[in-house]
A protein has these predicted regions:
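A short acidic, often aromatic-flanked loop/helix-cap motif at beta-alpha or helix-coil junctions
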Residues: 101-107, 160-161, 247-254
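GT-A fold catalytic core of metal-dependent nucleotide-sugar glycosyltransferases
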Residues: 113-167
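Short, flexible, basic/aromatic active-site loop/helix in glycosyltransferases
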Residues: 170-187
Length: 267
């Protein structure tokens, strides 16, 4: 194992297949309160006390089973899971990596984990997903192979950017291209962080820039991942191309479990 400056232990995990090497990254954090809206009925796994229950396989079962079914490599970052739980569910292809306590929200900190892991482990294709409400329908390697000109692939949310309090953060942190966002916010769909992927170099750059942006923002209690995502893909990486929704992911919160024409189902 390797230990980085944040205290994360890393397993060098490679797929030596003759095909493109693809990794799915996710997280299962239980030591801090779940940061999503407690009044949202679509949030899965949040207990009455605000925390996600420890050692609860049902929390990740659908995601886990879909990884196994598609014979994919995956890494799940965790903080409060028991060694017995990890030993029971870890396989040659699905690895659990425990992390030390952290200051950011559960949603934000996972990207620091992803960045650090990829700096030590190189793949061809990288996707991150939520573990509680995302299912992998089929190997997303094909999606990337069939779309050479696209850098990022993402889930599309169910609302427009203007319906999300994005501009508050844009103003607060003095981000660039404010006028562009104001002009387009009623037409732009909100990009959802629950599924994002691309080629290794693009995703490592994405995670590095996410972490850099997040550190500059300060205020670690702010659950910022959705805000930073919009800013990165629509402004910082405006010379790169991204697609969202079909064929990457099902319609968000429509629970389209029967779909086989997309690569991921997100709620």
């Amino acid at each position: 194992m390797l230990v980085d400056k944040l205290g994360l232990e890393f397993i060098i995990c490679r797929n030596h297949s003759s095909l493109m090497n693809t990794i799915i990254l996710s997280s299962y954090f239980t030591e801090k309160i779940h940061p999503n809206d407690p009044n949202d009925p679509n949030v899965i796994g949040r207990s009455a006390n605000g925390y996600v229950k420890k050692n609860n396989f049902s929390y990740i079962k659908n995601w886990y089973d879909s990884i196994v079914k598609n014979n994919l490599n995956a890494v799940l970052f965790c903080d409060g899971l028991s060694e017995e739980f990890i030993k029971t569910h870890e396989t040659d292809k699905i690895k659990f990596i425990k992390v030390e306590p952290f200051e950011y929200s559960n949603n934000d900190y996972r990207f620091f984990c992803f960045r650090n892991y990829l700096e030590n482990n190189e793949y061809d294709c990288v996707f991150h997903t939520d573990a509680s409400d995302v299912v992998v329908v089929k190997d997303p390697t094909e999606l990337i192979q069939d779309n050479d000109s696209i850098n990022y692939f993402a889930c599309k949310d169910s609302i427009k950017l203007a319906e999300f309090p994005y501009m508050q953060a844009h103003d607060r942190f003095n981000w660039k291209n404010k006028v562009m966002f104001l002009i387009n916010q009623n037409n732009w769909d909100l990009i959802n962080m629950g599924v994002v992927g691309g080629r290794y170099e693009d995703m490592l750059l994405f995670y590095k820039k996410f972490c850099e942006t997040r550190i500059i923002m300060g205020n670690p209690e702010f659950n910022s991942d959705m805000w930073v995502l919009q800013y990165l893909l629509r402004s910082v990486f405006n010379e790169k191309k991204f697609i969202m929704g079909d064929p990457v992911c099902s319609e968000f919160k429509k629970y389209e479990k029967q779909r086989k024409d997309v690569y991921f189902i997100h709620k």
